[in-house]
Amino acid sequence: MFDTKKVEIQWGGQTLTLETGRVARQADGAVLATLGETVVLCAVTAARSVKEGQDFFPLTVHYQEKYFSSGRIPGGFFKRERGATEKETLVSRLIDRPIRPLFPEGFYNEINVIAQVLSYDGENEPDILAMIAASAALTISGVPFMGPIGAARVGYKDGEYLLNPTDADVAAGDLDLVVAATHDAVMMVESEAKELSEEVMLGAVMFAHKASQDVIKAIIKLAEKSAKDPWEMAPQADLSAAKTKLKKLVGKDITAAYKLTNKSARSSALNEARAKAKEAFADATPQDQMAAIKLVKKLEAEIVRTAILKDGRRIDGRDTRTVRPIVAEAHFLPRAHGSALFTRGETQSISTCTLGTKESEQMIDGLNGLRYEHFMLHYNFPPYSVGEVGRFGAPGRREVGHGKLAWRALHAVLPTKEEFPYTIRLTSDITESNGSSSMATVCGGSLAMMDAGVPIKRPVSGIAMGLILEGKDFAVISDILGDEDHLGDMDFKVAGTSEGITTMQMDIKIAGITEEIFKTALLQAKEGRAHILGEMAKALDHTRTELSAHAPRIETMSVPKDKIRDIIGTGGKIIREIVATTGAKVDIDDDGTVKISSSDTAQIEAARNWIIGIVAEPEVGKIYTGKVVNLVDFGAFVNFMGGKDGLVHVSEIKNERVEKVADALSEGQEVKVKVLEIDNRGKVRLSMRVVDQETGEELPDTRPPREERPRGDRGDRGDRGPRRDGDRRREGGDRGPRRDRGDRGDRPRRERSEGGDEGPAPDFAPAFLTRDDD
């Protein structure tokens, strides 16, 4: 029934298996990729015809993580996979970026690439496997894909590169780098690093490129066994005559437009030239009109690229290494915890930093289960930033991707949660854009955190590099404009500190670049980053020592683990009382770390003292402030040190006699008490009478000690016999004759109600003690 084809290789200490012919057989190409016990299915389908009037390549990539792959049921009300998560969006882009340039120009058939994680073993990450499966499925599908590509993840630990490291390896190491490459050159790089040098980063890319060659060979072997017949491409029409006509018509207009340094003026001039070209083909067929528009764009690219390669002159008049003018301003917004306005040429970002408590952390539900992220960065790109009318609302894939890139750049310099126990949210609202808005987000975000008082290791700056490549001639350009991005061959973003690189992202629009070009771009980017750091330092060169007056304060303390339940109380009673009474928020971790937060330091101090009182042990002889919680006939129970209870006996309330406890004390009354004794069961005996209730100072004990009452000679009581265990009254021995107490008849009988030396009978005495026997 199945015509299964399979290829296996040993790769990075694991067996990589590529299989087709058993699952999703109606797709144009479907591959089941397995690494360890992680399994990803990728299916490719392509439309056989192009929609009328379509002049772009509609490639759509969807990556989906099935919860059953790790034995989990989705959380929340809806128990099924729903819209794409942030990770799914990022991996979809990771697959899309290296394969899109490998389709021929003029191919406009719609293609769907759908990758689904079917099994996840917790060690082998499915994103790399999804990239490999997508490449293999496209290669065997018959569509005009100029691949295949290979992919690899590289870590760096103890001076050595690691192929396909586990999550634990990445966390313990200094690098998490993903590379996609063809046989000849690198196509895409995505990375996060802990301030590594350019040499180490370049070495990691080359290491990944070499490792991906084994994957490419395996895909080619699978294609030799199972590839479908390649599609026949329609011959491209000869447009040389139309191109010559357009060059004569609008060539000079385009050249003049690109000499205008102002973006708005340049756009207006270019639109006029395009309208002029379109008018010249008004009588042509719709297909010819579309072709003419494409030719105008090609003319624009030729003019810009030639000026850069031959003359070294760019659109705005800069040379290839110069960075646009920079203006940075810290504390731009008065009420934000931290803020900055960062402007580089015609690109501008308002960046803010907001500090929160643990309860503000972002909950992330994924294949590995629930986890919480205390650092967030949200990038927003409204349509007005480019002077256009457009959709305004939820972030798209591009915004999610740009935000994550800036997140990686800044994540490496954050303090640990122990050093700075705040939740940090950065936002970047792009108010102007003409290239490299994600790197403006990095610079603005770094300044905003410093303004908020976040103790980052060092400031971070970022720069976007471009490439113009014609044959063997190339020019690497620093701080690219939007037009240079569109018309160039590479978008290469590098961010880092004065000590090294923290993130690097590269997208190639041609069939890859060489090691020489890559090295040149890295070194030129280092020069640009250093310049930008200098400009940022003019606005703020150090982290502020004080937090904003509007930011919450968090104090951290540690308590013994066995005291956690005492702080929480039965059903959370104690901790709720602490929060309700003091107004501070209290979070307790399983390791005994307690975080107390409030914008009022007095509230923090009150909660802290309360908790200290719960976990501390009372000391005999010390004086504490407490609250009366219960009155009984023989005294009062007082709660002190937050969670401790002790008894003040009626005799220890005052130096003078107290007839009724309720006459001297009331429930809820605050009192000062001294610890007299703690018995071996932990019972605490307290005294109020030796403490000044106004000042809390100890008073001298003026009460005379109780004298022993003489009991007289009780005489020889005789042999009481051996004592045995059990009821003494029932089984006790002979106590001997009783001493003669004499005739009581000559003494008057005392009435119990009259009292005597021992005072009146207490009110609570039972009836048989108070009744009249006469």
UniProtKB/Swiss-Prot annotation:
Pfam families to which the protein is assigned, alphabetical: KH_1, PNPase, RNase_PH, RNase_PH_C, S1
**Enzyme Commission no:** 2.7.7.8
Compartments where located: Cytoplasm
For binding Mg(2+), which residues are annotated in this chain's numbering?
485, 491
SUPFAM superfamilies recorded:
Eukaryotic type KH-domain (KH-domain type I), Nucleic acid-binding proteins, Polynucleotide phosphorylase/guanosine pentaphosphate synthase (PNPase/GPSI), domain 3, Ribonuclease PH domain 2-like, Ribosomal protein S5 domain 2-like
User: What Gene3D superfamilies does UniProt report for this protein, alphabetically?
Assistant: GHMP Kinase, N-terminal domain, K Homology domain, type 1, Nucleic acid-binding proteins
Q: What residue stretches are annotated with the KH domain? A: 552-611
The main place the protein resides is cytoplasm
User: Composition bias, kind Basic and acidic residues: at what positions?
Assistant: 700-755
Q: Which reaction does it catalyse?
A: RNA(n+1) + phosphate = RNA(n) + a ribonucleoside 5'-diphosphate
Q: Which PROSITE patterns match?
A: KH_TYPE_1, S1
GO cellular component: a single term: cytosol
The GO annotation for biological process reads: mRNA catabolic process; RNA processing
Q: What does this protein do?
A: Involved in mRNA degradation. Catalyzes the phosphorolysis of single-stranded polyribonucleotides processively in the 3'- to 5'-direction.
Q: What is the protein's given name? A: Polyribonucleotide nucleotidyltransferase
Per UniProt, what is the name of the gene that codes for the protein in this document? pnp
